[in-house]
């Protein structure tokens, strides 16, 4: 069978799905990611959609439709935006979508958790399940939690996620020794390197 050349962009020009997470489930590749709105006021304004293609033909992408809507999360007030998600197949054979809610800068609060939705198929209609919890059963809350990545490591589900320390927004960030020591250790940078950035080591 003759195969076509794979090229970018592989999605339609009207689709903006950054932070992509491709996964092979069965004989298809499923592409998940955040969903930007053309001309939008900020990023991640649209609900999650999914595209898939046969593993053997990555030129033949199919629109699977909207798989999850921000309004399905009962815990978060408007504006409801969702940062980049990830999907993993659980040990029970179902598919779990991990995501973090976002919003306009300074709105909606920053103390968030990693939420979970579940579906019987990779690109079906996901339903809200709950939040990731600490061992004591309390919600795992992090300051500006975003872009979780999750994998099934031979039966153990491993979750990784991005975050930002709230002290990076404080007026005394560049003069507080505790904050500076934390940044130096986290990024492997000297005090001088940290202080050379006007806002934070993250730019």
Name what the model sees in each region.
Residues 1-203:
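Carbohydrate-active catalytic/glycan-binding domains of CAZyme proteins
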